Amino acid sequence: MKVTKLYLVRHGQTIWHAENRYAGSSDIALTADGEDEAERLAGWATSTGPDGVYSSSLVRARRTAEPSARALGLDVVEHHDLREVDFGQGEGLTRGEMAGRFPDALDAFLRAPAENPLPSGERGLDAIARARPVVDDIVAQHREGSALLVLHSTLLRLLLCDLLGIEPNRYRSLFPRVANCAVSTVGIGETMALLGLNVPPA
């Protein structure tokens, strides 16, 4: 069976990660460690050889993708619809801070995170609806090849659920953590298959 491989990668570390703050659609830069992670990802890309490099339009994703694209002699193709879920009033806050400001909304979000957005935020289901067509177009462009997509923690997990036919509200329980610059590989052919999850770039 002929397979197209998608390498889904979370961007490198940002200053908000150490504090466990929800970055969402906020345009937060990488830390020095995040830049180093991006360089290690480029080493992985050199040995793996994806045919295309794509990223969210947010700077933390683009800066993570750029070293890999340079190493491969490619340009980064940005897509605004691959940006992270917008967490509304939760942007920049820790979960503890959210519990103090809007506890009921946080509880609903944690119970069914794809259906219940944080106040003034975006539903996970709507994020899937905007991002999945982009992913499908990338698959069509790289039929029987491969592509590297630099994304964000929540959107990446939502897309894994959608691609694999998993109920999207389960993204937290099934995929509790995606490490910065770790690679999750989905094989797309007659069926979808998870070929690797959260693998550090070697």
Where are these regions (language model features)?
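A short, N-terminal amphipathic alpha-helix
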Residues: G34-D51, D136-I138, T185-G187
